[in-house]
Amino acid sequence: MHNELKTIIEQAWENRALLQDPAVQQAVRQVVELVDKGELRTAEPVDPAKSEWKVNEWVKKAVILYFPIQPMRKMEAGELEWYDKMELKHGYGELGVRVVPQAVARYGAYIAPGAILMPSYVNIGAYVDTGTMVDTWATVGSCAQIGKHVHLSGGVGIGGVLEPVQAAPVIIEDSCFIGSRCIVVEGAHVC
């Protein structure tokens, strides 16, 4: 279904000079947009009954390739200012996601309808499913996969695993409760 995009991403991964081509940049941005919408994932369940997952390396490569093609820019919200390459996610009302003040998610992170973000942070490539609460000061790292009806308690750190691209991200399966101040990293799989 996404074979053409996959081919372009794999070629650009092997030859970074191709990132100068606007068509290649568009392909990278398209993959990140699909991740943002939850239509592509950096990792996905293969057999949920056995808790088996596969890493979509080419999607992770696209996320990594997104960084060098994005220009640095100033972003403002009232008197607050940021200077970064990554846009922030927006349109939460239309997405059906509750987001309280001080919560931040980067564009390229999927947050499902019914999820709740307390003052927290969700990084690019992450997937947060419906009914999940990312509680106060919790962080969801790049490419982490968080299931349905999960509670990431206050101060939880879910590590991100962008590289190496073949490495499994942190996976928290459906209905898990991760207690306050826990740190889950380096491809851990909680089910």
Identify the residue ranges that each predicted region occupies.
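Terminal amphipathic alpha-helical/low-complexity segments used for targeting or macromolecular assembly
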Residues: M1-V97
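Left-handed beta-helix
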Residues: P101, R106-Y107, A112-P113, L117-P119, ...
